[in-house]
Amino acid sequence: MSKAIIVVDFAYKGTQRKGHGTGRKGLSSTLKYLQYRDKVQNRLAANRDYERWQDRGMGIHWRDIMKNSDALQSKHVLAWTWVISPAPDLMALIPEAERRDLVCDLTERIVEDYYLERGFGVPEYSYILHDREAKMEDEGETMQQLHTHVVLPGTAPLDGVDRAAVYNNKERGHDVLFREIASRHFSEALDRIVGPEWQLLREEPEIEPDQPAPNDLDAWFPRS
């Protein structure tokens, strides 16, 4: 199996608190962490007027997002939280000045297409871009890992009704759809910016069958 070109995942915060990290308290803690976790390096992050969140309807501050999550929750889901993380080795092929805009553009395309392909209208959402150093499994070196955290409501617009509950179930193939959409958009971006040669980083090495030594006649031509 070839290595993934982009990692995506979804999780949710339920409407009821059922332990540590769940319910409204769990969501508010997560939002605060996402908003302020790099404030040592980026002191503007603690400023109410600093737009760290990219607002597509849920707000530019954790309090706004919390308020909108309350208003747009479903019976069981207060908010969905996504992670979208393109592979660092492939992102390294992108000119540095273009990387952040690319990840933001990818995030918006993935959100929009996922909901449209599920039959919903595009819901309100907000996302935040994080930048960290990640250790690569194979090489042991660290590389820049740009990724986004997306917060979406428990409901979405649906034709014929005002809004409907959204559930993401692996058993129904929603995770496969999520990965396919993300991979499609990232591969198209790589083709456009880098060219098809990026695919060389994802080709599986050919495994040659063990062959006998050239002078081993018994192996090539077994004795009768």
Give the predicted meaning of each segment.
Residues M1-S224:
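N-terminal nicking endonuclease/strand-transfer module with a His-rich metal-binding environment
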